[in-house]
Amino acid sequence: MKTIRQWVGGEYYEGSPLGVIPVENSATGEVTAELLQASKEDLDHTVEVARDAQKEWANYSLSKRVAIMFKMRQLVLDHQDEMARLIVEEHGKNYSDAIGEIQRGRETLDFATAINVALKGEYSHDVSTGVDIHTTRQPVGVVAGICPFNFPAMVPMWMHPLAVATGNAFILKPASPTPSASLLTAELYKEAGLPDGVFNVLSGDRRSVQDILVHSGIDAISFVGSTPVAHIVQDTGVSHGKRVHALGGANNHAIVMPDSDLDFAAQHISASAFGAAGERCMALPVVVAVGGCGPQVAEKVKKYAEAIKVGEGMGEGVEMGPVISAKAKDRIVGLIDDAEKRGSKVVLDGRGLTVPGYENGHFLGPTVLDDVPLDAPVYTEEVFGPVLAIVHADTYEEALKIVNAQPFGNGSAIFTNDGGVARRFTLDVEAGMVGVNVPIPTPVAFYSFGGWKESLLGDTHIHGPEGVTFYTRAKAITERWPTEKTYAATMSFQREE
């Protein structure tokens, strides 16, 4: 059986592992590899290597860094088929979705190739006689990125291109079920010419995360995952003197107004709710149907959803793969069962789906629930599966209250042909990313990504301009170069008369 090791200092590294973690093929249920679990000693060694490498890397000119990022961008493009196949094998998502996440992740590499522009400082001439001020941004040092299983390529690429391009060293802690895309990324960075030790991959379980959070040699932490863990990351990291941004969970809502094109809305809702088997923080698990249009929306979504081909990710025409594990499947089925007991109408039931030849895989079909009570766990919790819950509201105002009452604020959308209502929604909804007739309002990489409320802990969003801010520290430099005319020193603030 294949053994998956760490990547430290530009090479594969075995170290002194605590044990192994099984890596499973979600479509077959079979264990395909054993992942070495890093020890505290492995982390200490990795941090030491990263700190030494960062000192050299920070002194590379911006032009040299940009050249390496350009090479890396091209290498990711050249190897996207290989990377996508690794993702399909471990995560289970269909091949086209795996290619799609790599392409979206590569957008951050695109942005990183212009880091010489993003790092331009500010300058003021003669703020006082003969005194100039300018600002510069310098790397924070060693950054750790802690990533979830659902996007093994894209979410790490939200982090490491900007962290590396701004002069930091990076330690990537991938999710244990999906480590291989991160290791291929490490190989590509080496081929691109990145100095050894600047990019490292260290795998493990929650003990590895805890070790990262308290390690004195790590200066900043980027995290994407569930909200309960995000709170731990934020609280522990900050209390140990680290810069932290922690992106938590989501329960994204879309309001469907009765004036909207319901066929258009249903088609996009289906793709957004069931793409990637619903295992994404920008999935659309909840629709708030206004003015009695709920049953129509449910039936129209059903028409599109029941046509989705579910199967093994490399299968021809497959549009949706399995969920990540048997445990995840059981939890999702339990939420559907509970919703049915509470009176929800099961418009489309995916609980009994099996895929011929993959009976041990963790498959569920798309499920559409209508008239879901607001106290049902399938509504209140982050489902992270192929389930759409439709709730009802009489008016736009009632629908907005429902959307804003939830603790999450990642992404929200509205379907309407009324520009006035749409504008009100964009201003009034409590979410960090908002779509008008766009169900997954994920911004491109030169904007920043992140939510509000329980969906984001910390002060900065990820990638884009806020990403550059997070991975750097500002320094204001005040200069005076005396000439023949000298200035007397005083004990007070210098000022012009």
Task: Tell where the protein language model's regions lie, with residue ranges.
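Residue-level signal for inorganic ion chemistry
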Residues: G29, R65, I87, L109, ...
